[in-house]
Amino acid sequence: EFFPLQVASYNIPDLTKHRKILLTSLQANKQIAKSLPLVMPLKDSYTTTNRYQTLFDPFIEQNLPHRGIDLVPTENDTIFAPGGGMVSEIREHRGFGLTLKLEHTEHIRTFYAHLQKTLVTTGSQVKRGMPIAIVGNSGRSPGKTLHYEIRYDGNAINPEHYILYPIKMD
């Protein structure tokens, strides 16, 4: 049996090679497929300013692991749920500003930071494509940006390796 998050450990050529297996697995379990964060959280045009890598943090002048991707919207500032789940936490964080966490499955969570405001409350159930927040400039961010992470059992994985469907959610 192929578990969908095994895809996170593959490099890009392997990801392409195993995409068919993953899609077959998801078709066999449509409930899991509805929950997994398989699309980007921004619907319209955006620029990716930082990727999942080691980055220099100008605020503390050190290289640090960047465990997500930073997206700057060029049109719509609304953040949409990339998969179904429950809002498990909304809170202020010193570095990340206003943050939101979605619990998609027992093992999979997504994290959103630097928000202007949330459009949901803790405990809310969301479906893929529902508006959940507005991109902002809270915390230590260089401007209006969304910091987005996918976590499996608490460990960050590269969100760009996990997207299966087209970026736009028309």
Briefly describe each language-model feature range.
Residues E1-T47, R51:
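Non-catalytic extracellular/periplasmic "stalk"
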